[in-house]
Amino acid sequence: MNCLTDTHALLWWFTDSPKISPKATNLFDKCEKGEITIFIPSIVVAEALSVFDKKRISFNFKKLFKQINDSENFVLVALDYPILQKMVDLKDIPELHDKIIVSTAMYLNLPIITKDKHLQTLSYIKTIW
């Protein structure tokens, strides 16, 4: 089952954080083995850079970005018109980055790997944690 990741899940997997759930870890492991594809909204990479710049967690951003770029099983998704169209109707999501992530998941019809409690309550998307 292909899916889409949010920033926390991606960074916690990349840094081997104990904060990541077993289900999420399993999905990233399957992606590394080529069994599934994980889609990464461009805002997730931008947020990862912001986390790196602010030194909120320690990791090698260039290594993460290279791994995403070099992998056939991680797919970077640009923010474009169809995704922006979906964002217009998302009045119940206050954070811009979450709107972009949810809109991207809706556009691609994919579940989101996320620990975000607010996103988990939304009836119109599927989340995995």
Residue ranges and their predicted role:
Residues D92-H97:
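Donor nucleotide-sugar recognition loop
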